[in-house]
Curated annotation (Swiss-Prot):
The active site is at E90. This is Thymidine kinase. The gene is tdk. Keywords: ATP-binding, Cytoplasm, DNA synthesis, Kinase, Metal-binding, Nucleotide-binding, Transferase, Zinc. ATP binds at G15, P16, M17, F18, S19, G20, K21, S22, D89, E90, A91, H92.
Length: 194
């Protein structure tokens, strides 16, 4: 997984909803634990979809996690034990401070692995992930399957009429779509408004 991991680095796992980001992150956690590199696993307080105190993949794989409201609280947790890595799921719900914290932790020698959406439902850069991508040593961009045409999907299409950017949801609110089908869906939504 990593060649000569002996210094800090940042890895970002990104892609649309339903692409397996949490599953990929859980694989990284298992590898770290197998190698006796203890990870501090966290997620934002905002993410309560499947569990309040666990990362849960759609395949049902789970791992206990610490819940943080403020990403700077990670420094207090790091004092509790000899962690070698910091693993963050649903990182797009943290603010831009995450970029500074991740960079600082990597500079201090931690392996920082972050999973989150890089785009919102409008296909615009979302949260801190785009800036993390710029400073990451390793990037894994996953794809889902478009529910309309079954081609590779790179976007999360919002099916409901809500306009706020931060809308927690799952299959009822979102679906994976390719660029073409996403654009067609957005056009259809606009026509319904008229």
């Amino acid at each position: 997984m990593y060649k000569n991991f002996n210094e800090g680095m940042i890895e970002v796992i990104t892609g649309p909803m339903f692409s397996g980001k949490s599953e990929e992150l859980l694989k990284r956690i298992r590898t770290l634990e197998y190698a006796k590199l203890k990870p501090l696993v966290i997620k934002p307080e905002f993410d309560t979809r499947f569990s309040e105190n666990e990362i849960v993949s759609r395949a049902g794989v789970k791992h206990k996690t610490h819940i943080l409201k403020n990403i700077n609280d990670v420094y207090f947790l790091l004092q509790e034990d000899k962690y070698k890595a910091v693993v963050i799921d649903e990182a797009h719900w943290f603010n831009e401070e995450l970029v500074k914290v991740a960079d600082d932790l990597a500079n201090k020698g931690y392996l920082v692995i972050v999973a989150g959406l890089d785009q919102n439902y409008l296909r615009e850069p979302f949260g801190p992930i785009p800036n993390l991508l710029a400073i990451a040593e390793r990037v894994t961009k996953l794809q889902a399957i478009c529910v309309k045409c079954q081609h590779a999907a790179s976007t999360s299409f919002r099916k409901v009429a809500a306009s706020e950017i931060n809308l927690l949801g799952d299959f009822q609110e979102y679906e994976a779509r390719c660029r073409k089908c996403h654009n067609a869906g957005q056009k259809e939504k606009l026509q319904k408004k008229v």
